[in-house]
């Protein structure tokens, strides 16, 4: 079901999304959804009688040469197995999916006529997919401060860092997670504003020089 909504084949090369822990024939009646699979999340899943954790960030990441109690990853994988809990992680495939992370962010912010920020391929229906979204702000342009307040309130953010390049907000790029490296695509798409979670200082300077309002 998840693979139909956000195909794992669309994940980025560095990613490790997919069915990472468990048995394929395991019966599932209760699912815990989480951003990360931590020891606390595993305990909560066990206490609530869940057979599956669906997480955004992969519980197994990078090169893993062993699964033992001597590493953080090993301890979590062993705990999942001991509790009989499977793990499926949908990361960049969910970021890129139609209706996924970035689509949801863009809709919450009031962006219409959405297109991918960077096209990585096409789905079975021939529609382009890719990480990030670009759209026009409904209701016309607004000030950077106004848009920053909207983003903070709408997305429930505890804080937001703003670079005001002195241009109104109208065509907005959204990149959930660390998407600061996509600034060239933002410029190529003619965006005046970029909302992302990346905080690298050099990219703020580059955005200012390019005349792009940046929020993170």
Give the location of each predicted region.
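Hydrophobic structural segments
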Residues: 1-215
């Amino acid at each position: 079901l998840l693979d139909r909504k956000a195909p794992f084949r669309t994940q980025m090369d560095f990613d490790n999304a997919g069915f990472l822990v468990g048995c394929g024939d395991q019966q599932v009646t209760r699912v815990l959804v989480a951003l990360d699979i931590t020891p606390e999340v595993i305990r909560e899943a066990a206490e609530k009688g869940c057979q599956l954790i669906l997480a955004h960030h992969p519980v197994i990441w990078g090169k893993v040469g062993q699964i033992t109690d001597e590493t953080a990853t090993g301890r979590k994988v062993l705990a999942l197995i001991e509790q009989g809990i499977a793990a499926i992680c949908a990361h960049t495939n969910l970021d890129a999916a139609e209706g996924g992370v970035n689509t949801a962010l863009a809709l919450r912010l009031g962006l219409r006529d959405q297109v991918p920020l960077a096209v990585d391929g096409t789905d079975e229906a021939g529609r382009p997919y890719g990480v990030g979204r670009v759209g026009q702000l409904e209701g016309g342009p607004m000030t950077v401060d106004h848009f920053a307040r909207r983003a903070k309130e709408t997305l429930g953010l505890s804080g937001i860092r703003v670079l005001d390049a002195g241009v109104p907000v109208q065509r907005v790029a959204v990149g959930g997670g660390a998407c600061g490296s996509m600034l060239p695509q933002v410029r190529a798409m003619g965006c005046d504003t970029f909302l992302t979670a990346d905080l690298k200082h050099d990219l703020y300077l580059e955005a200012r020089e390019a005349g792009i309002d940046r929020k993170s």
